[in-house]
Amino acid sequence: MTEVSKLKVGVLGGTRPQGKGLALRWAAAGIAVVLGSRAADRAESAAAELRERAGVEHITGLDNAACAADADVVLVAVPWDGHRDLLGSLRDELAGKIVIDCVNPLGFDKQGPFALTVEEGSAAQQAEQVLPDSRVTAAFHHVSAVSLADLSITDLDLDVLVLGDDREATDVVRALADTIPGFRGVYGGRLRNAHQVEALTANLIAINRRYKAHAGIRVTDI
């Protein structure tokens, strides 16, 4: 098992539901977390809320650049339309670090959610292009922000597909997934296959709407 208990995880988009929910769960599991936002005061306000909810002190809030510089591993949980520009502005701060991209390029119309076409192939591959000196992975696409935020749900019952071309980096991300009760990190292939994982989120949203659920996925026979 890869040791991750001493790592500090930065969350870009840490004031938004997905990033904030993962930060809450990691902090509750004993992982130090730093939230990133365009405004440091907004990030610190969110961090104060999570400290109270999780009953811990190891959550801080900084602006995005300071968050990226301070963390050992950085989760990208920002809106798709600002994805490229934000990562491009943080190239130096993210150099040499494991970056976990959980962004889903989706559109919505009267028929529901659908996957957008990404020039680079996927959000994760775009991150890889923009951050050539970082160790880019893709994971945490299929996690319900509602379930993450509800600490009364003690077992989230979910497999987290982890993609990437760096074995050590994907092992770290899998181990970070495993720290959250009910999560299991599962290697899901090379980064070039991330578009399939990102697009599947549209199907899960459709399932959730039809069945009034917070669906995830499980991989069998492993």
Say what each PLM segment does.
Residues 48, 88, 125, 175:
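Active-site phosphate/pyrophosphate- and oxyanion-stabilizing loops and adjacent acidic/basic residues
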Residues 6, 44, 70, 96, ...:
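A glycine-biased structural micro-motif
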Residues 158-222:
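Active-site-lining helix/loop region of Rossmann-like oxidoreductase modules
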Residues 2-49, 179:
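NAD(P)+-binding Rossmann beta1-loop-alpha1 motif at the extreme N-terminus of oxidoreductases
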